[in-house]
Amino acid sequence: MTFPVAIQVYSVRDAASKNMYGTFKKLKEMGYDGVEFAGLYGHTPEEVREMCEDIGLTPISAHVPYIDMVRDPEGVLRQYAEIGCKYVAVPYLTEEYRPGTPRFPEVIGNVKMIGAVAKKLGMTLLYHNHDFEFLKIDGKYALDILYESVPADLLQTELDLCWVNVGGENPSEYLLKYTGRAPVVHYKDFVGGKSENMYELIGIEKKASAPSEAFEFRPVGYGKQDFPTILKATEKAGCTWVIVEQDQPSMGLSPMECAAKSRAYLKSIGC
């Protein structure tokens, strides 16, 4: 089955921050159907909406910092409603809010609140996982506890299949677990094993030590993920959008070249 394919703009953030319109135009030429935002790079919602309309890209979703949505949910989310986003996502939890800390129950309550505000504005809240949500609490993954605790009409999944794999689960099987609750899925490829310094690789936490293993993000189709099987699971799970994400470029390629390789590979397997 052919799915519309978007790209998480964080993957090409340097180019987008310098020239969003030109970058979006090149992404459209590569065959991308939509974009998922990670900031607006100084543009107004109206300007971004007009860019997408002019180029023919669907502004499908946005990653919005958790704490920003907690502090001013309606004000922050309204910007993305004005752009035309169907979804907004909690992209990442800093250490003090993660599973296993005293503040994780607070996160669950806030996610319910944010989901209600998003629904009021005509959008659906998603949660984008990393590997740390695969911590078990009383025998259950924290990620599963989150989805059990928040009603489906207030929260849907945005499973990042790289991090599902790193977290110790089979990406296809875990995606199928959320059949009917997985409108958007992140396709991300990688090689190597889990590093003690994973989050330096996604540009969020900087530490002095180098990664202890040769973990590297790759263009989709150029790593260890089984995407033909994942694509079948994507269809069975009822997903409606595939989103490509590559946190850091690799293989000696630029971020835009990596984006092009990912899209070309997905076309080659019928997506």
PLM-predicted stretches and their roles:
Residues 1-87, 156, 232, 260-271:
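N-terminal pre-domain/capping segments
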Residues 12-18, 34-47, 64-72, 95-99, ...:
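Acidic-and-aromatic substrate-binding clefts and catalytic sites of carbohydrate-active enzymes
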Residues 25, 34, 66-157, 177, ...:
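Active-site acidic/histidine proton-transfer and metal-coordination neighborhood
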Residues 36, 61, 89, 126, ...:
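Conserved beta-strand positions in the central sheet of alpha/beta enzyme cores
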Residues 120-224:
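Acidic/histidine-rich catalytic cores of soluble enzymes
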Residues 222-235:
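A short, acidic, amphipathic alpha-helical segment used as a generic capping/interface helix at domain edges
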Residues 241-268:
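C-terminal/domain-terminus segments
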